[in-house]
Amino acid sequence: MPNPTNEELNVATWKIPNALGIIGSSANNEFNGMTASWITQVSMEPLLIAVGIDNKSITHGLMSASEYFSLNLFSENYTKVFVKFSKPAEYKEGFLNEEPITLTENNMPIFDNAIVWFEMRKKETYDLGTHTLYLGEVTDCKTVESDARVAYMGDTRMKYGGVPRGGH
């Protein structure tokens, strides 16, 4: 069987249906939000969610330095937020990149426009090459709109996955 080309690998992996979310992180009074698409539940008891984070990202540094992080999911009709957080975030009290946030008791940003959010305690980390897999145990969550569908990669023009290409 022949080896697939990088283009074939990219096109194939972009077909994997991934939810889009914003990972909220903070450490040492620095805050960030980052668009993420590698998100999945991996255990029911304890309730664990895994997220894949680029090792070169600001979020990776903050998550490595903190015990907690958040996952914020948005409506399929509110996808502009993901473009805002494809670059490092600017924090102004109560806002990240002009998106309103509320800080939890653990100082993690929760996005006010999220339709579902989770706060998680970091349980395990696995360095897997270009990315680190963070396992978080859910400590708090809220569903704001139970009937709304959360956004996924197909709701945007974003493509993330496959093999490294220009700029990554």
What are these regions (language model features)?
Residues 1-168:
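Basic, polyanion-binding surface patches
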